[in-house]
Amino acid sequence: MKKNTKWILENKTNYEKIFENKREKKLDFIIEDLIENRNLSLDTNFDFKLFDLKDMDIATQRIFEAIKSNQKIYIYGDYDVDGITSVSLLYLALSELGANVDYYIPLRDEGYGLNKEAIQTLKNENTDLVISVDCGINSIEEINFANELNLDFIITDHHEITGDIPKALAVINSKREENIYSFKYLAGVGTAFMLVYALYTQMNKLNDLEKYLDIVAIGTVADIVPLVSDNRKFVKRGLKLLNTTKWIGIKQLLRKIFPDNWDTKEYFAYDVGYIIAPIFNAAGRLEDAKQAVSLFVEEDGFKCLSIIDKLLENNIERKNMERGMSILEMSVTEIEKKQLYNKNLILVANKSFHHGVIGIVASKILDKYYKPTIIMEIKENEGVATASCRSIDGVNIVECLNS
């Protein structure tokens, strides 16, 4: 058992509810008891309403205006799986509404989040509106720069708010205190889905929403957010769609990795988290995350097969890097030699580390020692370092770094 494991005492079991659910859903008592003790729900209906998130009304009004006037919309995303699925979801949904839309995902070397060079590039391409997904909540300078260019910005993000809210046209984040919606742990793709939900509700297209939930499920599982409340509902409903997914690229990928039963097997969060998501993640780590987005949005089956071959090749390269695991081995050796496990925070830095896998290594170090962990790639020529951080329950590493 892992040291410092957090024990959670069971709730006082509501046996009246258990008997009711057993009658209605024919559940085993043990399963129902586990569901009750974990505060889970069997309900798969979402808990949100149209404008439960602050600025949702402003965002949808501006998007409808852009669609009506055929204005150029760019979706700006992150290069991890949450960002990839967020971009794909919003691109597909806006395209269906008739929007003039494209997407931009920075290369990993550009760094996480918004950057001024990219914003200038989008402005030069006569972009009228940028919608960020899975990034932007702390990009105050970048949004100020966009305002100077008269470039409208809608931020959709789920990360911690570390200071003032950027002065974008609209800022949608489940962690905003002004929200009516009380659940604060949406993934980026869940936040993007809330925007799509609001748009489609106003267009009387709610029946067209369900088909997107497999994309939402992949991003939600990959981002390791708590699978409770609406996150659990996204995943539960989305996993059931994978057998009959309407997205040609996803269908081709599932056929490739589950050749015997892709269309009949029952999919679990494990399949997404450990088999499907790493294939998309490898694109952002080693190549260009736009490859992964193209698999979601491409309608030509032959092109999809070519994209899949490249993604699988990237994933093999990623696995080989991890198997060699020089970074993990070097990190563990340094931790043990210097007894860093006795400190409140573990920090390991080296110029030979590869930025594409330091996040994976940080997660493995966290699992091994259960201490907040920072793994850094030192870029000697630039005089900076790139880091990935992982933390334990009860320690907000963002607040620690800002203090």
Spans of features found by a protein language model:
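Phosphate/diphosphate-binding loops
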Residues: 129, 133-145, 152, 401-402
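Generic detector of well-ordered alpha-helical packing
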Residues: 79-83, 135, 158-159, 174, ...
